[in-house]
Amino acid sequence: MATIFYAEPELVIGHNRKILFVNPNDLQIFKEIELPTDLLSSCGLKSSSTSTAEQQSAAAETGGGSVVEGEEPKDTKTIEAGASASAPTVSVQNVSYSPDRQLLAVTTAGQKALVLYKCRPEHAQLVSVRALARASSAIRFAADSSSVLVTDKTGDCYQYDCIETEALPRLLLGHLSIVYDILWTGDQQHIITSDRDDKIRVTNYPATFDIHSYCLGHKEFVSGLALLSDEHICSVSGDKTLRVWNFKAGKELLRTDLPAPAVRLHHRQLPQKSDGDNADNLQRHQLGILFYDHVDAVGLYELEGNGDVWSVTVSQQIRADAGSWNICNFALTEERVYVMGAKDERLTFRCYNSSNGEPITSQLPEGWLTMILDQFPGDAGSCLPEDLSVWFKKRFDNVSDYLERKKRRIEEQQQQHKC
């Protein structure tokens, strides 16, 4: 899965086995990470869930979670060190910076692993590689950067220690469907998760067996969350709505209709306004939303809030030539929106002005796109966007035929009684 995000002052691009760190102003690459082709075997690990399942089962006994007895690991084949020819391909799945910008967490697909790097100005130092039982769906660091949460596509959430890297992962909580996004509050007392079954769950930490509240109201998958304050979050969903919640009370505070289902959410806090009587209490946030299959590919919204009163003050749509290429992700900076996608199944990028939604061409250095794409030659540059249609609920009508047969049977019985 191709990924891109902005972590001031860097634009981070992840695709295939490479992660690029780019200056968002002149688009010069100043650092890169390339994952080994045989990631797990090169670190003496097995590419399977066998060893990981044993670790996670032991961790669950002390981690506030449980493991279903008799559950067989999904992956049973192992790959010994040196058998790299038969190893699954490695590709970047999720990338996240720690709040102190000292650590970078990467989860991979193919050979499923959590890779931890210590970041330096000119290079990144590998800290640990830990095998995952299942493909990850989201990752999130603790506010103090001491641990990282990893959710997988079966709905489980594990905590991995970033200091004691040999420590076993701890199973914290589980959903009955895939978790699309996860938040961890600044005081580390609540973990907030959203899933395919329309739910936003607020779980107490560290006693994760205790659910604090639910934020209910969405009618489709909840694809993105953003933490607005110590008590407020916003969410976007496939039901074409943006909502603001008081997550501690489980109360909906604002609902705004969107032009299309939302599949990605990026958030940036804005400086407070200097004028006005309530300027000190007024919070301002910018939200970037990627839409599913819509002429307006990306929507930009500004939120203002004072206490439990929130409103959308500004909105801007960016068409990004939607329909001419497959858009899979984007990054939101102060003045620009960098859009990532595939054209003719090859990776490409485009840049737009966040204030008016127009393409930026004259302000970008010549050859910037070629310079970035040259880092992904040959098969490394191939890009097949994820089929997001599977995110939507499939509804099957298995009652209408039964009711029709029942109706005919009753009518026949009534006719027989008349005769």
From Swiss-Prot:
Task: Name the InterPro entries on file.
Answer: Trm82, WD40/YVTN_repeat-like_dom_sf, WD40_repeat_CS, WD40_rpt
Where in the cell does this protein reside?
Answer: Nucleus; Cytoplasm
Q: Part of which pathway?
A: tRNA modification; N(7)-methylguanine-tRNA biosynthesis
Q: Output compositional bias ranges, type Low complexity.
A: 51-61
Where does this chain mainly localize? nucleus
Quote the cellular component terms of the Gene Ontology held in the record: cytosol; female germ cell nucleus; male germ cell nucleus; nucleus; tRNA methyltransferase complex
Instruction: Please name the GO terms of the biological process aspect recorded for this protein, alphabetically.
Output: oogenesis; spermatogenesis; tRNA (guanine-N7)-methylation
- Record key words, sorted: Cytoplasm, Developmental protein, Differentiation, Nucleus, Oogenesis, Repeat, Spermatogenesis, tRNA processing, WD repeat
Known SUPFAM superfamilies for this protein?
A: Tricorn protease domain 2
Question: What this chain does, per the record?
Answer: Required for the Mettl1-dependent formation of N(7)-methylguanine at position 46 (m7G46) in tRNA. In the Mettl1-wuho methyltransferase complex, it is required to stabilize and induce conformational changes of the catalytic subunit. Required for binding of nanos mRNA and repression of translation by the mei-P26-bgcn-bam-sxl complex. May cooperate with mei-P26 and nanos to derepress the BMP signaling pathway. May cooperate with mei-P26 to suppress expression of a subset of microRNAs. May cooperate with mei-P26 to regulate bam expression levels in germline cells during gametogenesis.
* Protein family: Belongs to the WD repeat TRM82 family.
Further information in the entry reads: Wuho means 'no progeny' in Chinese.
Q: How does it assemble?
A: Forms a heterodimer with the catalytic subunit Mettl1. Interacts with mei-P26 and weakly interacts with bgcn; required for the function or formation of the mei-P26-bgcn-bam-sxl complex. Interacts with nanos; may be involved in mei-P26-dependent derepression of the BMP signaling pathway. Interacts with Myc; the interaction may be mediated by mei-P26 and may be involved in the regulation of ribosome biogenesis.
Q: What is this protein called?
A: tRNA (guanine-N(7)-)-methyltransferase non-catalytic subunit wuho
